[in-house]
A protein has these predicted regions:
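N-terminal active-site beta-alpha-beta segment that forms phosphate/nucleotide-binding
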Residues: 1-77
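Conserved phosphate- and dinucleotide-binding cores of soluble alpha/beta proteins
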Residues: 52-195
Length: 195
């Protein structure tokens, strides 16, 4: 049942329909669901933080789509050193979760900095949490431990973003305020996957 829900995940459609008209949106890397959503819109400006070279790939994809579209999305690659300036120039920050728990999301590097800066400045931060990404606490913690198992913390492939830095959650149910979001696990804990 969960597999079918993942394949038919309405999260990108909810996001595309809910993004403010003409908004400047900051994304990190190439988020699959948020990337799909911004491609559905022709009135946005996307500031893509070039996390692991993925922001530039997203911008190239947006530009190719714009060549076939009259409106097209305006997209710009931002070096990670410019993350604060990009966030402060945005109307909205999208942080896409590769996994989520009741208290946090796991996202690409730079996401925590972007969310913290935005929250501190009163800029909305929407966590994009697709179907199948809400995990039991033990599974989430195990995943965090695995991606963080590097020689130095700044080499980790992902980082934890506390939900307290998020204003809204975009999910299967639509765009909801953080405190109203259902972040309960979507699947039982598989003990054999831990460790």
């Amino acid at each position: 049942e969960l597999t079918g829900r993942i394949e038919l995940d309405p999260t990108p459609d909810h996001l595309a329909a809910s993004l403010p008209e003409g908004a400047t949106v900051c994304v990190l890397g190439w988020p699959d669901l948020a990337g799909e959503a911004v491609l559905q819109r022709g009135d946005l400006r996307v500031l893509a933080i070039d996390t692991a070279g993925q922001g530039s790939a997203l911008v190239r994809r947006i530009q190719r789509a714009a060549e076939h579209d009259d409106a097209g999305v305006d997209a710009e690659v931002i070096d990670p050193a410019g993350i604060a300036a990009a966030v402060l120039s945005s109307d909205l920050v999208l942080v896409e979760a590769s996994a989520a728990s009741l208290e946090a999301v796991l996202a690409v590097p730079g996401s925590r900095a972007a969310a913290t800066i935005a929250a501190d400045e009163g800029i909305p931060v929407w966590a994009v949490v697709g179907v199948g990404r809400r995990l039991p606490a033990a599974a989430f913690d195990s995943l965090v431990e695995r991606v963080g198992d590097v020689r130095v913390a700044w080499d980790a492939e992902a980082e934890v973003v506390p939900l307290r830095s998020v204003s809204h959650v975009v999910c299967e149910a639509g765009v909801v305020e953080r405190d109203d979001a259902d972040m309960r696990p979507e699947c039982p804990l598989a003990h054999e996957l831990l460790g």
